[in-house]
Design a protein with these regions (language model features):
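Helix-hairpin-helix/helix-loop-helix acidic hairpins
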Residues: 1-41
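Generic preference for well-ordered secondary structure
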Residues: 5-9, 45, 49, 74, ...
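Long, low-complexity, intrinsically disordered segments enriched in glycines and aromatic residues
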Residues: 18-19, 23-26, 57-58, 76, ...
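Catalytic DNA-binding helix-loop module of base-excision-repair DNA glycosylases/AP lyases
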Residues: 26, 33-70
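C-terminal accessory module of base-excision DNA glycosylases/AP lyases that mediates lesion recognition
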Residues: 63-147
Length: 147
């Protein structure tokens, strides 16, 4: 299904009509498994695709971060839209914080092996929350095993 519509999807991307692309091609994509065709929501796949096309505007989102922000029972794409918008607003209102963070990274990484100046702010936030979310998952696992 997606392969047949590649040109149409590319046109939507060029027009930056990202919600329309999701609604038309990824919210109920027809997936063939063996001899059956079934509808499947591909929100997670689509958000990874957006991130690949433009990592400066679209964050990568995985389930631990989605759950960390309290969206465990929400649809992936809607959660993504809210979290991505929140990241963008945080970045806009905290430019000086990112300048300070980059400065600290450069003091630690004097040879600039991390290339921190070229890492998008969205990626920095994603790394921070990925760490926090996975730490919370590990803590929850330990609490389950302790009881």
């Amino acid at each position: 299904f997606l392969e047949k519509n590649t040109q149409d999807i590319n046109t939507f991307f060029q027009n930056q009509d990202y919600f329309e692309i999701y609604k038309k091609y990824f919210s109920k994509a027809q997936i063939r498994r063996k001899n059956n065709t079934m509808g499947k929501e591909l929100g997670s796949f689509y958000t990874k695709l957006l991130n690949s096309f433009d990592p400066n505007r679209f964050t990568a989102l995985d389930n631990p971060i989605k759950n960390y922000f309290g969206f465990k029972s929400e649809g992936f794409f809607i959660s993504y839209c809210i979290i991505n918008k929140g990241y963008q607003q945080f970045i806009e209102t905290n430019k000086n914080l990112f300048i300070s963070m980059r400065s600290i990274f450069l003091q630690i990484d004097k040879q600039d092996k991390l290339k921190i100046c070229s890492v998008p702010e969205l990626k920095i936030l994603d790394l921070i929350f990925w760490y926090e979310a996975n730490l919370a998952v590990e803590k929850a696992k330990r609490n389950i095993h302790v009881r």
